[in-house]
Amino acid sequence: MSRRLMLTQIRPSKPTSDIDRYEKKNIYSTFRPCAKHRLGNAVSYDLPRLVAQKGVENVYDAIGALPGITVQNGVYMLGGRTIAVAINGKTQNVAYDQLQELLRAMPASGIERVEIIHNPAARMQANAPLIALTFKRGDAESAPFTAEVGGDMSLRHRTLFGERVSGTYRKGPFSLDLSYMHTHGRVLDALRTDIPEVLSPSGGPITNTQERLAATSKHSYRLAATYTLGERHTLTATYQGFNTNNDLSVSNTDSHFGSAAGKVKAWLHNARIDYSMPFGVRLGVEAAFYRAPERHVLLDYVSPFSLYPDYNPWLPTLSRQDFLVTDSLRTDLWRAYIAGEHELNNGWTINYGAWFKKVKHNSVHHQRRHVLGYNVEWNYPEEHFTTAYVGVSKRFGEKLSAEMSVSADYYHRIIITQWRVLPTFSISYTPCDGNVLSLVVSGSRGYPHYSDMNGIPQPDNGGYLYTLRTMSLMPSLHYQAQLSYATKGGFQFRAWYNRASGHVMQQLYPDGFLRCVILSNKNVDRHQQVGLQAVMPHQFGSWLYTCLTLGGAWTRDKYEPTLWEVPVNSRIIHGEAKFTGVATLCSKPNIALSVDAFGQTKTQQGVWELPAHAQLDMSLRWMFCKDMATLRLFCNDVLANGTPKYRYMVYDKGFDLRNVPRRHVGVSLTMRLGGTR
């Protein structure tokens, strides 16, 4: 069964002529990121150069190459918080796992500029650090048509293939962008679980290795059309989505053994229309429809020799528990917004707006067990989000600027109704050309993922491990303060303090009646973090680029449990380091070697300990045919040690969960077409 483990909107302001001149003056021939002074505490990066040298194919992997970005539980994090993404000024509102699929279908070569806003203002309509992507639009001198085709093959104990195509057409006021990706093959994952006797429902230790083989076929696509009416009227229509089909085969070994077969499908349709008017008003509507039906048949044979140590070995019998599980999940999203921004006299700017979102879920869960019979559960909650905001910004000469905004957030679910007022204040000072000192204080909301609260338990590990969903999860409230300094050469130094109430984390407790261990998502009473980070890029001539990111944080989690649950009052200091290096081995032919390394000391998430781990990725890139073709060889997780282990300590015994690490090797080829008139 699928299982989620500890899961834990920007309008592009038109730059002034001074900033335009400043940007042109600071376009380096290297990959060195340049900090540029922008309202909203944004730092702009010349990412396309680094993407070209590393040979990165898609937008999702390009975001991972940004300084300061780390990965936690398969999710991109920035300053200890999950990121949000905006594409051409439009924040993406689909869930993170759905957004991940869409970004993988978009070509990285289309990126023109990337901005990072660590604490976005209310006008940016984001509750997390924002990665604002701007894609190339072309001009009168550009070619009317460009295209890119590519394919890749990767091996991680099974072979996975991918084909992709993207194209851009521009003529006069009209532009059209298309991207499509098809992925197919087999994926093998292995999950190892060690349950000590103090937590075991049988009184003895349980060790289980679960191998999951998926035959997958996935289609991802995006179509965006923009038409400029008159001088400054702009109409944009975007359609994006994916369709995936997985046939699963699962086997359990060690303490108990058995098998499972399943079929998992999912498809997403997301459409939006945005309209910009010349006097600073924008409005838009959006709809998304997501479907994810599943069907699993589990045949589980329990070995008595390890589950019941005192059982007479001369009477070997096997107890059988088989069950059929079907689940049908539907999610419908509707969203509408209106926003305005106007420049006033003496450097003042005012912005205002409001948006409304309605999300309707529907899930029906059928379960038929060999012993307990037939069971049906269903959930059909609705979520309503409403936000209204107003803000002002002011430039005090060429060196100082400030921005302040206030938003009123309303959230409603069948058992919850909440109002919150969230302020944001930022001030930036430029002591000299290219250096920026910023202070930001902000408040934001976090909302639990629907899969964490759909009220339907999901069995795993042969039925001895259950992930229990709960509808009682509440939205979390976050307050952040950050002080940062960015230099002209791209160095960044950052200190932050985060405080959250209601942060969602996963807890566990044994259930003797159900004879299983239950994993349940809970709202942590208090989550605090104080962190430091330094980003230090450097260019050595024209042949070597390096970027070293060092960070550390003090984190505290506190949770007062109810009956049978585990209390949490953890404090820990941990550090992490990330290194990126790109060496040009030869200019003719154009060959470059890329090395990415990441290391982290022991840390903790709620009741779970994460021992220290490290990961090393390497790739070799060759550009030929006048740099219109790129061949890339890569090996991810070279040391086979990049997958963290999640451990819960009971006295001197550990309950361990770990995906078995495997090296990931492959080759990709990309061809660019067009680009010349």
Model-identified regions with their sequence ranges:
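Extracytoplasmic beta-strand/coil segments of soluble accessory domains associated
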Residues: 60-95, 123
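C-terminal beta-signal and adjacent terminal beta-strands/loops
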Residues: 622-677
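Outer-membrane beta-barrel signature, preferentially recognizing the C-terminal barrel domain
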Residues: 445-495, 499-501, 518-531, 536-539, ...
